[in-house]
């Protein structure tokens, strides 16, 4: 369930005003309240629609479905809250408020584990889906930082199903930051969802690190931050992995595990090869793979 920015802002401010040193837990609890409030609001709207059904049986069925959906939504809120609190146990109590100084950015994205050189295209395949990621010459200024725009498109059986622009920048220490995305999901050529869109500096969104300059085993960090929309987390779980994909054999790969409180059961392992970048994604539950097939250019 995506919680509205206004509800989140009001509840986080209200809870924070009562004090407490643990900003992470305070945030998790406030978001849980916002999630439950939104679920109940949607339930009341559903009941209002049910009331306008003249047929008694249809009305009762509508009310029963609304109640079931409320129960499911509240359980989802609870599961997400537990996942956020588990993350807090590792992230610590401090507010998430990274200092972004534009003067500390400006060079090329040449981190050996995630080089994003304009003109480079990466082609991935997994099952019926293919993914083409192109590092463009376009730049976008966000929070005063000039970001590289990456165009990422996903096809399912040849049909375009997702079209995304991602924005990245590297600081002078070599960390690669993620500043947001403009994403569209499509069906039959029509946009059906823009869920997941966020831009650092807008509605409380903040950038996160997608690749550290010197990753260490056990590192646990935020990759993005917009409560209720973008909450990906990553943990470094391997430093010297070997990977075989259609694009070749790669040694010395970094392995990370990505999770998000928005989908508590989802876990994805990613492998990054020196000098190449992302070469493999593996669903930790199903074992399904998205593999690098080809690197073109620059």
Predicted segments — roles?
Residues 1-5:
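Positively charged n-region of N-terminal signal peptides that target proteins for export
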Residues 8-9, 297:
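A ubiquitous, low-specificity "background" feature that marks scattered single residues
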Residues 9-17:
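Hydrophobic h-region of N-terminal signal peptides that target proteins for export
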Residues 18-94:
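Soluble, non-transmembrane alpha-helical interaction regions
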Residues 64-298:
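Conserved functional acidic sites
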